[in-house]
Amino acid sequence: MTPQVLTILGSTGSIGESTLDVVSRHPEKFRVFALAGHKQVEKLAAQCQTFHPEYAVVADAEHAARLEALLKRDGTATQVLHGAQALVDVASADEVSGVMCAIVGAVGLPSALAAAQKGKTIYLANKETLVVSGALFMETARANGAAVLPVDSEHNAVFQVLPRDYAGRLNEHGIASIILTASGGPFLTADLNTFDRITPAQAVKHPNWRMGRKISVDSATMMNKGLELIEAHWLFNCPPDKLEVVIHPQSVIHSMVRYRDGSVLAQLGNPDMRTPIAYCLGLPERIDSGVGDLDFDALSALTFQKPDFDRFPCLRLAYEAMNAGGAAPCVLNAANEAAVAAFLDGQIKFTDIAKTVAHCLAQDFSDGIGDIGGLLAQDARTRAQARAFIGTLR
């Protein structure tokens, strides 16, 4: 068997580490060509020692020099690259068959798009790629024969329970709606009057999942679910009015598909990202993920409730941006990234995140942008507007 050759973008984050855990269980199936780890040099050096990639990519020359010194000390022959173009290069290299796109934020868009242009199998964990450039990205993938496999647990769950020949045809397959589940985050039952006193340390403590700081805050505001709605719209060619969100605090049911005949098919499992990663990497096989069996005896109850937009205004804003279309999702994402960064840095209150996003969505912006240059320019304009607004909140 010829192993699949992988580039893993965001290898030092939680998705990247989970991916490498799955890869390590199947050395005969996978070979790592490149790892990208931004600024976590020590962790990336350890990964290079274990997986021996041809290339490792970091953010800049300073971190590249540090990584080179560590690799030289340990006798690891991996070549070190740095910068945005290096991410594009390792994502589109001829040797590579599959790319794990797990860089957080819109900064992951150019490398994901480069992989699509080269017809790679794309394991998509970077939801911002589709939020910012859904039409452009999916059309690029289709035109170049790139397979886009969803790694996000919710979209992966939907992918697993849809007919294999689904290909975006809802009506033909009798699909009434797609239902994304959400845990509700750490503040599902907290007093709304305390929200303006929520600290970054509290917001990053997710009750069920192990995630990075940014996505943990997005889960706490439910912006994460809003971004996932937009992602599902593009991934599954699903109209906004056929997308539902239900809060399911136990995070056992990862998503559902409602069919016209009254059936609802769901995918269940322990909340561990290695399950969707292994499903994508192993297709069409089911391979060992390292995740334990779901213990039904230990489940006391599975509960569900509708999301409350007063508690989660970011989810409402995401619905509005999805329905508006055009550049609105790009604006939504850029404003949210700027606001979450400011919150984590202690510059604004938790409740100011939604205020910042609402402010930016109220500004004038182009209805539609058809190329990556225009999208990145809109992203930059919105971030500047968000930073200016944040300055008035301090």
UniProtKB/Swiss-Prot annotation:
Pathway note: Isoprenoid biosynthesis; isopentenyl diphosphate biosynthesis via DXP pathway; isopentenyl diphosphate from 1-deoxy-D-xylulose 5-phosphate: step 1/6
GO terms for biological process, alphabetical: isopentenyl diphosphate biosynthetic process, methylerythritol 4-phosphate pathway involved in terpenoid biosynthetic process
UniProt binding sites for NADPH: T12, G13, S14, I15, K39, Q40, N126, E128, G212
One Pfam family, short name: DXP_redisom_C
Keywords: Isoprene biosynthesis, Manganese, Metal-binding, NADP, Oxidoreductase
SUPFAM superfamilies: 1-deoxy-D-xylulose-5-phosphate reductoisomerase, C-terminal domain, Glyceraldehyde-3-phosphate dehydrogenase-like, C-terminal domain, NAD(P)-binding Rossmann-fold domains
EC number in record: 1.1.1.267
Catalytic activity: 2-C-methyl-D-erythritol 4-phosphate + NADP(+) = 1-deoxy-D-xylulose 5-phosphate + NADPH + H(+)
Cofactor needs: Mg(2+); Mn(2+)
Function comment: Catalyzes the NADPH-dependent rearrangement and reduction of 1-deoxy-D-xylulose-5-phosphate (DXP) to 2-C-methyl-D-erythritol 4-phosphate (MEP).
Family membership noted in the UniProt record: Belongs to the DXR family.
Protein name: 1-deoxy-D-xylulose 5-phosphate reductoisomerase
Source taxonomy: Bacteria, Pseudomonadati, Pseudomonadota, Betaproteobacteria, Neisseriales
